[in-house]
Amino acid sequence: EAGIPTFVDKPLAISLDDCHQMIDAAKEHNTLLTSYSTLRYADQVKGLQDRLENLGTLVAGVSTGPCDFLSQYGGPFFYGTHAIETMLAVFGHSVKNVTGRMVGVNCIATVEYESGALINLNLLGNAAYAFHIVAYGTEGWESVPIDLSSCYANGFRVFVEMMRTGRMPLTYDQLL
């Protein structure tokens, strides 16, 4: 309400209604608003984004990360956000359909994109702590473990750039 640029550490909120209230307030008070997992700005994620077209037409992919469905901080919204945002950063936001299956504390979802590409999203509750992304194209494939050492500084720079330029790094629709 004070018009101060705002960064909400992931997730933006754990209910769609709360997300809409925050976005509406930002619009009403003409203030910048963003929220993201800094993993989307890790060097390895950016590198795969830059090289994705070299793989030809995207056919399939995998995004994997830890998740605690029972977390006191909003269940899967707290930690699962990392693997989801990594997927969206690399493969885009044009998701058509999502189906999933939960077994114990692990969930595997199949994310169908408008292009027809299928992405397996692995939200793992009892596997070794790791973030990983794979892209399969018609001309090649690439598997990328994600190192967290660059993401925090890169994510901070994105927020500073938002304040400097007055342009949000993600649209309101992408925040949802």
Locations of the language-model features?
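A contiguous active-site-proximal alpha/beta segment in oxidoreductase catalytic domains
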Residues: 7, 12-73, 83
